[in-house]
Amino acid sequence: MDSVTLACGNGGKETSALIERVFMPYLKEFIVAFDEDAPKFEARGEYCVSTDSFVITPLIFNGGDIGKLCVCGSANDVSVQGGEPLYLNMGFILEEGLEISLLKQILQSIQKELFKANLKLLSLDTKVVPKGSVDKLFINTTCIGKIIKPGISSRHLQPGQAIILSDTIANHGASLFAMRHEIKLKTNLESDCQLLYPLLKPLFLSDLKIDALRDATRGGLASVLNEWANSSRVKIVIEEEKIPLKEETKGICEILGLEPYTLANEGVFVLALNQKDAPKALEILKSNEKAKNACVIGEVLENPYPSVVLKNAWGFERILEMPEGELLPRIC
C-alpha cells in the first residue's frame, strides 16, 4: 500500500489493513483497550478536558509536524489549566491519495510525543474522504487531564500581580510565514512546538499560588493578555523591552511588517501571580534549560476600563489591541 484509498475507509478489510499495518506499529503500546468502541477509565477528583483540531500547512515544518503539534497542542491546553495530561482521543481525516510514507512519518512523531508526555490513547478513529475534500490530513484531538494545581482562571487577575513569560515569542508564527511558498525567505528559525507540562510541573508541585496561566497560541501574547484583562476587568502594563524576542524572529517581523505580539506560539506560556512570588517562580522555571529566557514582562494594575498597555523604553505607551483579521491561516 503506497497511498490511502477510499476503500481504506469502508470499515472492512482495507480499513483493518490500514489500522494494523500503518497505525498500530506506532500507537499500539499507548492504547488502553483494543476492539472497544468506548474504552472505560476510572476518574476520581477534578478533571479538565480540551478538544482541538489541527489543519496546519505545511504538514511538516521547521521544528515539528502536524503529529507533534497535535499531541503538544492538546496536552498543553490541559497543562495550563493546572492539569496533568493523562488520556488522548484522536481522529484522523485522511485525503484519498495521501502517501503512506508521509502518514508513517507523522505517526512516528505522534509516537515520540505520546511517550514523552506519558499519555494513553482512549480512542482512535480514521475517516477517508475523496481527493480534494481536505488538504492531505486533518487531525482532531481531545485531551483529558487531572487537576493538580487548582484555582487557575483567567478571572483571577488582580492589581499587584506580576506577568511572567516563559520564553521568546512568535517563533512558530514567524517560521511558518517564512516557509510559505509565497514568502521566499531563508531562515534557520524553528517552531517552538513543545510539551509544556515538564516545565510547569515543578511550579504546580511548589507552594506558589498561580492565579492565571495560558499558552500563547493563535493570536499570540496580545490575545492572551486582552482576554485576561477583559475577564478580570483589569489593566495590564507590559514593558516592551523586557519581552524576549529572537533576532531572526524580529527580522522577519520587520521585513514583513508583522507585530510579533500577535503571532502564534506553540511552546510558550504566560502566567500571573503575586509580585512577591515572581523571583521564586523564575528560579523554578529557569532550572529547566527550556525556560532559561523566562522573565517578568509586566504587571497588573487597577483600572475601571480593561486594557493592555505596551510601554516602550522611552516611557511612551500604546494600547496593545486584540488581534483582528486573518494574518496567516492554518497556523495550527
Describe the role of every protein-language-model region.
Residues 95-97, 189-265:
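Active-site-proximal betaalpha loop/short-helix elements
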Residues 287-332:
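Acidic, Ser/Thr/Pro-rich beta/coil linker or hinge segments at domain junctions
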Residues 273-279:
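Helix N-cap motif at beta-to-alpha junctions
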Residues 30-35, 118-124, 207-216, 237-240, ...:
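Flexible, glycine/charged-enriched surface loops at secondary-structure junctions
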Residues 5, 13-165, 171:
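Glycine-rich phosphate/pyrophosphate-binding loop regions near the starts of catalytic domains
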